[in-house]
Amino acid sequence: MRIGISVFTHAGQNVWENGLGQNVFYLARLLRTLPFVEEVLLLNCGDQSHLPDDVEPDGAGFRLIAPQDTTDLIDVAIEMAGGLDVNWLDQLRSKGKKVVYHCCGQPYAALIEPTIFGKEGYSSRFERCDEIWTLPRDRCFHPMLESLYRCPVYDVPYLWEPAFLERRATLLRRDHAVEFGYRPQPRKEYTFRALRAAVLEPNISVTKTCSIPMLICDAAFRANEDAIAELHLLNTIQMKDHPTFVHLANSLDLTKRRKVRFEQRHDFAGYMSQFGDAVVTHQWQQDQNTLYLDALYGGYPLIHNSKWLGSAGYYYPDADIPSGACRLIEASRNHDENFDSYRRSASEFLAALSPLHTMNQTAYSRSLLRLTSVRDRRAAC
């Protein structure tokens, strides 16, 4: 079996722009290990002839080819990080090839937000694929997707590995003499460690914004000023003059005490290595995120509302701000002392996400074999 996965290339690209760009290579690496997969190609949906420099060596061994040039080179096309031309997909399917749309974003938000908020969004003809694959977090949207795309929808495992993070950490150490990862301090030096809390939500969708984390950090500061040294709000420069955001930010005690920094977008490892000690997050119906995994791998206290993470990090339910504040204060008091057990718990969780984990390889093998065993899904009722 020969498989093509879509990627989007553009000038000035780097792998830290979003998690999706990394996920392509996690999937490609997994598929290449399957015994019945002969080759994995990258379908170039952009305007560059090469992958970003920071993708190497993860991109090594994967040919980057324009989709139209792979018609006779692949048996399965996976639309993932770049939109594929529907006429070409029709041609593929007419030849008996299979097409999968791997939906990694939150599908309801992607459908609704562009219309309501006047945002640009990618759109293509719905009836273009044989199956849709989603991450387990989006299982509740399967009926919606089946209705829209007129094809079956299935879960596939979330994949992650630390290769990109480790490479970035190596560059930071070599070029800037800074170390990635949380650095515990001897307990005798403090009762509550004054944490530099970082909020790294992208603020481009209602599913992941900084509002709840801001309130959690401020509630923690009001309850115990010794627990919070600073609040760093990344991806907020574009909102700093919006009246609603200004009103929210100015209401915080942290702002009144000049302890808030409003920042543009930065890569996780580069920023946390220099300016952060803890990560405070919030999500709505999108609890599988690369940010969480990067934070756990670095040993940083992760205050989150993701049930998916289980016992990893510091969990608070839903949008429970008092609970989140208590977990942040708990991290301030106990994280250094419990650092080793925190790292062990995180490592156990992260290991299960590896593209080389047998359970993940088995799940994707079954998905591909199911996909290619059905002659014509469109005829089914």
What do these predicted ranges mean?
Residues M1-E17, L195-P202:
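Nucleotide-activated donor-dependent transferases that construct or modify glycoconjugates
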Residues S6-H10, F25-E131, D138-P143, E263-F268:
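Extended catalytic core of nucleotide-activated donor transferases of GT-like folds
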Residues L20-N23, Y158-T255:
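Conserved catalytic-core segment of nucleotide-activated headgroup transferases in glycan assembly
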Residues E39-C45, T134, A229-Q238:
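Short internal beta-strands
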Residues L111-F180:
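A short, active-site helix/loop in glycosyltransferases that binds the activated sugar's phosphate group
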Residues M239-Y297:
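Donor nucleotide-activated moiety binding/catalytic core segment of transferases
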Residues Q274-S354:
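Catalytic binding pocket for nucleotide-activated donors in carbohydrate/polymer assembly enzymes
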Residues H335-C381:
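A charged, aromatic-enriched C-terminal amphipathic alpha-helix characteristic of glycosyltransferases
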